[in-house]
């Protein structure tokens, strides 16, 4: 049993009717005024009813989770399992980049949200790392893939531009913040999808894995606007800021698709259960992927693809994504969060 998390339970305002998240949208950066032609920013939720973003303690027991945690669906299982390959290194990188940018934040509300975001992402990284350990215990070793992911985030997207490329430090930081904002657009969409993916329950999916995915997905919806607001705050002003935001999505989309297909292919090829089935190396199949989509076990291409033109709108703000109410309701009921809270309570009484 693992029991991880870096802070106290998240708290909320008086009522979770919070579909307008406390986002800052197209606001000006530090010390700026809004630029002519830019849409007004969405109003922030006033204190004290503001939704507070903070990490939660969670506890997952992987002992009884099978390798194919969606029964009879190795393709759907491994397409979703790519999350575990990408997120430990990716979310550590989010935290590192945000730490670099913290001195630029002069908005107390945003600073509080960013610190809560960093705590949540650090917790996500730890929990998905435990799934990699569980896969290794089932003889599915992922290190040959994850070392490339580590190289991407630690070297190519590290604190210094790769290969000595002469990019000013401030611009390199802004570029990486734009990448995180674009990635978080997809994680919010995926988070909202998994919260409503009843087909996963009907397919008999492992309850522990579903709880991990839905707990994580709910927190992605919960902090859906923070990375965008951070970029808007630190990313300069006017048209250059907007153009860099578009550039971030233009880079993230093909790279993320490539990593996902590569990751799913890797998992299929190295799956010991599939290798035992007979001659021929198992492969990722787009046909099988689309069949899983049709059964509701994976998000549709339209659900994922439509997130891109929405993000390109000048007036866009991520508070439009998903249902914060549904996310809050799941977080209040998550078995992992409740188990960890109960363990803390029992320890306090001893």
What role is predicted for each listed range?
Residues 2-8, 13-15, 21, 33-350:
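Non-heme di-metal
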